[in-house]
Structure formats: C-alpha cells, structure tokens
Regions:
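Low-complexity, Gly/Pro
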Residues: 1-153
Length: 153
C-alpha cells in the first residue's frame, strides 16, 4: 500500500506541470493574438520563388481580429476570409490558416511566422502540403513568403 502514495504524488506533480504548461501556452497565444490584431500592409511577397513587384505587393492588406479571424484585401476589396490557429510555443512559431471565403474555401494552409518591430514575416505552404521548416519560397516548395508592416491608425 505504501507504493501508492509516491505514485499518486508523482501523478499529481505531473498533472500540475501539464496544467502549468497549458497555462503558459494559453498566455503565449493571447500575447501573440494581441500582436497579430490590426491592419497590415504586405511590403514584400514571394510566391513559388518569384518575387512580386513592390507596388503590387503593397496593394494587399491583411486585417486580423483578436479572435483569429482574418481578411485579405486587394486594393480595398476583400478576396478571402478565414480563421487562424497559432502556436507561439513552437520553434518556429506556427500558424494554420483555414479559408472560410474565397477561391480556397474550406482549405487549410500550414505556416510559420515571426514578429519584428511593427512587422511580421509569414511563410505558408500550399493547402494540403507540409508546414514549412524555414522562411523560404522556391519553385520546388511552392511556399508563399510575405513580409507585412503594421499600418498606423
């Protein structure tokens, strides 16, 4: 019977550690959601390794809401909407974008992201493909690599 007490104590410690880790992840998600929130202008865009002209990239804005909803606008017209799931505890940080409106409705793209000062970099794989491991876009990997700057209100 004495063996049960140490085992129970070990389980209690393990459960407490898992809860603390979950709390840390929730806190990190909340912090990054706050960073994501707002309107962002694309300043650099590469698709399949092809860099878009700066003036074309700057026609695109992304509006992120605190709850993870987002919209992509081109010259002020919404071309896609969706939801996002982020995990800022991963290295690199991960994002899953699910399209709810637009050409790719119902599809999910896996990606990675990082923040700079008033900027963020995102690299996304085509829907159904593996998550990028690094921030790169080539003809072979088919990734979209974008740098966005926060727009001032």
């Amino acid at each position: 019977m004495r063996l049960h007490a140490p085992l129970g104590f070990a389980l209690l410690i393990a459960m407490t550690s898992l809860t603390a880790a979950g709390d840390d992840k929730d806190k990190a998600i909340k912090e990054d959601r706050k960073k994501y929130e707002g309107t962002w202008q694309v300043v650099s865009l590469e698709v399949n390794g092809n860099k878009s002209a700066e003036e074309d990239a700057k026609k695109i804005t992304v509006v992120n809401e605190a709850d993870g909803k987002w919209a992509i606008e081109v010259e002020g017209k919404v071309v896609a909407r969706g939801t996002s799931e982020i995990d800022p505890t991963k290295k690199p940080k991960t994002v899953d974008l699910t399209m709810t409106e637009g050409e790719d409705k119902g599809k999910t793209s896996l990606g990675i992201y990082e923040f700079g000062e008033d900027s963020r970099k995102v690299c996304l794989a085509p829907a159904g493909k593996a998550r990028p491991a690094e921030f790169s876009s080539t003809a072979a990997n088919g990734h979209v690599l974008a740098v966005l700057k926060r727009m001032k209100k």
